[in-house]
């Protein structure tokens, strides 16, 4: 019997806290359906669970330093909740708790993160999230996070825009943290499809090549010249979709690669988050969000 898997299933189905799910399963002899009934009888969940609701808003937050850091996405349902003081504080607590237990979380993943105790508290992260979810009436979800630590002569850099909707985390060889953060800022803003040219799938490269249209007089040129022209076309397409080949947003006279090289930096890894990317979000105007919040509080 995989008890952790049963706890996870019960949490996903009920949105109840981890401790409540564990207790419910223990008294129900690890029967999920019986545990759901127990939770309902004890007022730990509402009959209509939030589990299937869409939480595509929220915040991206960072925590850590140049040696090890985390980029976190904590989701809620509306912008109204996302920019409330309590949600912002919760998001930062999540990030700080994860980075404070870096090795454990890196090795064991999200379930280990949710089971962590908060600093100076017996409450675990999953229950803190569930408690605030019950308080605000929205589905709150730790959607994803990425941890990076630095080795010898390496540095971790993070950037999150002030609106909390785009961010990036990077690992570079070299010690110019400010320059690396500038590249993280560029990555967040420009959102290239790929980081390195080597990341581009062969099928995409073939598509680029197929888009080449022969200019006038092309067939009259020597074969080597034709190959050079074709390669130049594909290289230009590659430069448009890769981070290192893009013009630096802060100085378009050079590429990101040239900027890094000038400052004796080498990019090893880079990951960008866009808040709610990949989630289909129901569009609601601000007035409707306020009205919804007011109705929940009455």
UniProtKB/Swiss-Prot annotation:
GO terms for molecular function: translation elongation factor activity. GO terms for cellular component: cytoplasm. The keyword RNA-binding does not apply. CDD domains: UBA_EF-Ts. The keyword Cytoplasm applies. Keywords: Cytoplasm, Elongation factor, Protein biosynthesis. It is found in: Cytoplasm. Residues 78-81 are annotated as: Involved in Mg(2+) ion dislocation from EF-Tu. Gene3D superfamilies: 1.10.286.20, DNA helicase RuvA subunit, C-terminal domain, Elongation factor Ts, dimerisation domain. InterPro entries: EF-Ts_dimer_sf (IPR036402), Transl_elong_EFTs/EF1B (IPR001816), Transl_elong_EFTs/EF1B_dimer (IPR014039), UBA-like_sf (IPR009060). HAMAP family: EF_Ts. Belongs to the EF-Ts family. PANTHER family: ELONGATION FACTOR TS (PTHR11741), ELONGATION FACTOR TS, MITOCHONDRIAL (PTHR11741:SF0). Associates with the EF-Tu.GDP complex and induces the exchange of GDP to GTP. It remains bound to the aminoacyl-tRNA.EF-Tu.GTP complex up to the GTP hydrolysis stage on the ribosome. This is Elongation factor Ts. It comes from Mycoplasmopsis agalactiae (strain NCTC 10123 / CIP 59.7 / PG2). The lineage of its organism: Bacteria, Bacillati, Mycoplasmatota, Mycoplasmoidales, Metamycoplasmataceae.
């Amino acid at each position: 019997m995989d008890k952790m898997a049963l706890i996870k299933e019960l949490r996903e189905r009920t949105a109840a806290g981890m401790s409540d799910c564990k207790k419910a399963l223990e008294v129900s002899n690890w029967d999920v359906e019986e545990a759901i009934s127990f939770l309902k009888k004890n007022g730990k969940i509402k009959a209509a669970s939030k589990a299937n609701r869409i939480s595509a808003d929220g915040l991206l937050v960072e925590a850590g330093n140049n040696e090890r850091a985390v980029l976190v996405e904590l989701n809620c349902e509306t912008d109204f909740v996302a920019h409330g003081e309590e949600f912002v504080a919760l998001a930062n607590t999540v990030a700080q708790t994860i980075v404070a237990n870096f090795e454990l979380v890196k090795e064991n993943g999200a379930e280990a993160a949710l089971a962590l105790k908060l600093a100076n508290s017996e409450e675990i992260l999953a229950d803190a999230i569930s408690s605030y979810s019950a308080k605000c009436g929205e589905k709150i979800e730790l959607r994803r996070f990425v941890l990076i630590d630095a080795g010898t002569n390496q540095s971790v850099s993070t950037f999150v825009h002030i609106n909390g909707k785009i961010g990036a985390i990077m690992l570079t060889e070299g010690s110019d943290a400010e320059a690396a953060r500038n590249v993280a800022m560029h990555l967040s803003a420009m959102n290239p499809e790929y980081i390195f040219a080597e990341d581009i799938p062969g099928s995409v490269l073939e598509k680029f090549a197929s888009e080449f249209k022969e200019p006038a007089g092309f067939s009259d040129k020597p074969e080597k010249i034709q190959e050079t022209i074709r390669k130049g076309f594909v290289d230009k397409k590659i430069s448009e979709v890769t981070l290192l080949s893009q013009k630096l947003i802060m100085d378009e006279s050079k590429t990101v690669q040239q900027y890094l090289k000038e400052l004796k930096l080498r990019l090893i890894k880079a990951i960008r988050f866009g808040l709610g990317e990949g989630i289909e979000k129901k569009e609601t105007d601000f007035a409707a969000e306020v009205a919804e919040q007011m109705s929940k509080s009455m």
